[in-house]
């Protein structure tokens, strides 16, 4: 029988100083975790107050510890600070959405979009096209329902050559970020139009933030200090479960 002193075991993948003991006294109960998940709501109204850098870094710390396929840790972050800078992304989002829905006005355009998106994707966008154009019109008239006059936008990006799980990795990081934001007193909302507008708007948003051409935006969160606090959370649909 061998007896080793404490800390004698080492691993080439984990150099000294890269493994931290778990602080069990900080671990929440199941009920506490579930209450955080239940009470997290999308926030769409933000105070005119910037989010401090140290607070943003706490959100990113939670995001970077999200699980990832093969533990590749592929997700990278672009932090857009300040209402003016976020508004510029909103303007590019509006242009990208307009460019995407424009073909649906014409038969030949609808045919081309079916070839690009597939029938189901094109039908879905065609159904939403009037609403999306309405959001663009509102934005151009001064009512921002795209990025909600938020003081902060975080883009979750990765090298697209990594495969389809780059999107999964990024959105696992998004979920961690939303929960951390909630715990820090921030409000957040998933900004799906930003990715859609970038994909179908010629990649203008990616170019605007100097994203490498090999990379893609897989997730986007607008964030800030909320103007309103919800005191209750609504029920969700029951889980559809098949037990095997």
Spell out what each predicted region is.
Residues 1-244:
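Acidic, surface-exposed loops and disordered segments
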């Amino acid at each position: 029988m061998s007896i080793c002193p404490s800390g004698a075991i080492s691993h080439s993948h984990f150099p000294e100083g890269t493994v931290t003991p778990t602080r069990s006294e900080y671990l929440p109960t199941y009920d506490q975790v579930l209450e955080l998940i239940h009470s997290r709501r999308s926030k769409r109204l933000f105070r005119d107050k910037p989010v401090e850098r140290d607070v943003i870094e706490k959100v990113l710390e939670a995001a970077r510890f999200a699980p990832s396929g093969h533990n590749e840790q592929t997700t990278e972050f672009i932090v857009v600070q300040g209402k003016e800078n976020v508004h510029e992304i909103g303007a590019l989002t509006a242009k990208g959405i307009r460019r995407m829905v424009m073909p649906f006005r014409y038969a030949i355009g609808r045919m081309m979009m079916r070839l690009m998106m597939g029938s189901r994707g094109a039908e879905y966008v065609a159904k939403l096209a009037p609403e999306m154009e309405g959001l663009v019109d509102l934005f151009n008239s001064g009512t921002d329902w795209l990025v909600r006059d938020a003081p902060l936008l975080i883009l979750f990006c990765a090298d697209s050559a990594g495969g389809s799980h780059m999107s999964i990795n990024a959105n696992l990081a998004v979920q961690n970020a939303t929960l951390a934001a909630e715990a820090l007193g921030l409000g957040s909302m998933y900004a799906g139009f930003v990715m859609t507008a970038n994909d179908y708007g010629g990649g203008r948003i990616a170019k605007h933030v100097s994203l490498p051409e090999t990379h893609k935006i897989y997730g986007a969160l607008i964030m800030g200090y909320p103007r309103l606090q919800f005191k209750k959370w609504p029920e969700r649909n029951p889980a559809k479960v098949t037990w095997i």
